[in-house]
């Protein structure tokens, strides 16, 4: 189809107008500079205004119009010409600023006694510098414009197969395999018309057809061929007939090359080289039936001949064989998230011991001396948020006597809270942590640049923040192996979860680590949708969350079966072995399950969720499945003993009471934290928790990183069949064929209490609300409890 000439006509019209405008504006600017031509006519007004405003820099305006006109005149304009056009505003601003700067320099030199020759030399140097700067800017615009163009188009993967389908003139590669023609299904029949392409025949060597084999298979040639027509079936002939060419007598040149034709329709080895022959000069009266040829529809992509089974050799023409796709690019190849996506904040210096810190040390000694405890300051370590004073207590003093003075020390130092560590692990001293007057910001970008020594060898490195000494704290989630995060609202829990996910996105590609995000609050993790690391879209419903965890349990058992077959103890050994022996195509990825508000799921699902989580925590470490549970309500019914026993690594943010701190860490201390990322991290290798200031990640940084990761590739979600909607198999535990196994236990609960309600059964049996309501309805149907009694519990009718 021919292109419309209208766009070209419009471009030439606008180009002519711009060219005429450039000439007129140049004359309007230059002519008033001469004595013979005054700027009194209206023609000279635009040039006069430009010159009075921008002086000689105004000559760049008609130059811009002329350049734009040339671009419109020339159809095949270059990339550098377009880059120069885009860079014009920068060149114009530079010229104007440089010229005004030169005039200011002249006025400054006018008050000095400088010779005219020196002034002229200064003017020449300034003009040359300005021209050099303009040339450098133009050169940079041309170079970086081309680089930006290449970078932008390199991010858009080209589909060469699709390009071949869209461009019928794409020449196929037929050097390795000669063209062949299908033998006729019968040696003789009525004369049939052989269709040729509508246009003139293409050059020699651009046709290829399919050759049926004896075993019901077809040979994939270098290109896919779509049969144009099917000739009528012919009767059988007992004697073999020589194959006639499928070329009409009026054809200007043969459609097939002369050598390589099959000489007989008898069964023969398809891989045997065909004997050379020549086309007969006379077409027989009864030409054998052959399949009409059609132009090649796609370029060659198959590297070698491939055999695939066919349905039936005798049922019509063979089915066209689709071209096999080229091997996909490995998703991890070149995966990298730039550091520039993160914001750079001003660096705060907090390492130095200033006079204020020394005064606090003196006040600390004075405070303890008021209670007849003579302590000695042996060290001061200043961190981004708190400063730790190391005290050496006198002999014979109980540590409990010192720790009980936390509130008195806070009052004396005018601090919001003071935490006393008695003793400091591994030291002969007591630590007193006092908040700094000015908190320093710990950024995620800073910690990415200053990694710890062993972070490169970690399987799943996670950046937490800095400790009280200012050292970066990076943990390996694969060694943790599970993590519990708890803290009150506004303590920094959500920022910690975002920093954890961001650490995975920066260090691991989608083929190395997969994420399963569960967000009952709906708004916290929704922004991570459509990234390639996700197994499923972010789950917000409790029912789908439990079904996803049940799928992970099945995946865990499948991985254990794979490890058993290769006699491996963990996923690291398995991936190493399959790589050495080339057993599998790609290693097993790690799976990280992040549940943002675990308390809401426990209320909705109850016992089933606790059982699934406990089983995953107990068994999934060896197969590379790790859990991160976050909650803001660290009560005993949410963080049960079964879950705590299987999650030894925990992070506690600021909580409201000592009891909450004991539930999380099994000790006090979290109630003394400052909030805004101040945390206590406890792992199995340490007997005392470590105080850390969490890394800060803003929402703008998250949006930029997620947008970059989304552009890398699309996610491959699990099949939606794992999220079944059948009420008979829902998470509430509906049993059709038989009674609920918990029915007898529920009857005993209501008979012992003398009252029956859905919420009471739900709390006592630790089950979901739907299942508890179904148990109450079943008791009512069997006459155990009475009908609903408004807001009061039901009456127990039978004991």
From Swiss-Prot:
Limits of the FtsK domain: 470-662
Region annotation (Disordered) ranges: 167-208
Keyword hit for tRNA-binding: no
Cross-referenced InterPro entries: AAA+_ATPase, FtsK/SpoIIIE/SftA, FtsK_alpha, FtsK_dom, Ftsk_gamma, P-loop_NTPase, WH-like_DNA-bd_sf, WH_DNA-bd_sf
PROSITE patterns referenced in this protein's UniProt entry, alphabetically: FTSK (PS50901)
SMART domains named in the record: AAA, Ftsk_gamma
Pfam families from the UniProt entry: FtsK_alpha (PF17854), FtsK_gamma (PF09397), FtsK_SpoIIIE (PF01580)
Positions with a binding annotation for ATP: 490-495
Main location: membrane
TM spans (from-to): 14-34, 55-75, 85-105, 124-144
UniProt keywords, alphabetically: ATP-binding, Cell cycle, Cell division, Cell inner membrane, Cell membrane, Chromosome partition, DNA-binding, Membrane, Nucleotide-binding, Transmembrane, Transmembrane helix
GO cellular component annotations of the record: plasma membrane
Location(s), subcellular: Cell inner membrane
Claim: Protein biosynthesis is one of the keywords in the record: no
Membrane topology designation: Multi-pass membrane protein
Gene Ontology biological process terms in this record: cell division; chromosome segregation
GO molecular function, one term: DNA binding
Cytoplasmic-side positions: 145-799
Description of its domains: Consists of an N-terminal domain, which is sufficient for the localization to the septal ring and is required for cell division, followed by a linker domain, and a C-terminal domain, which forms the translocation motor involved in chromosome segregation. The C-terminal domain can be further subdivided into alpha, beta and gamma subdomains. The alpha and beta subdomains form the DNA pump, and the gamma subdomain is a regulatory subdomain.
Function comment: Essential cell division protein that coordinates cell division and chromosome segregation. The N-terminus is involved in assembly of the cell-division machinery. The C-terminus functions as a DNA motor that moves dsDNA in an ATP-dependent manner towards the dif recombination site, which is located within the replication terminus region. Required for activation of the Xer recombinase, allowing activation of chromosome unlinking by recombination.
The family this protein is said to belong to: Belongs to the FtsK/SpoIIIE/SftA family.
Subunit structure of this chain's protein: Homohexamer. Forms a ring that surrounds DNA.
Protein name: DNA translocase FtsK
Organism for this UniProt entry: Treponema pallidum (strain Nichols)
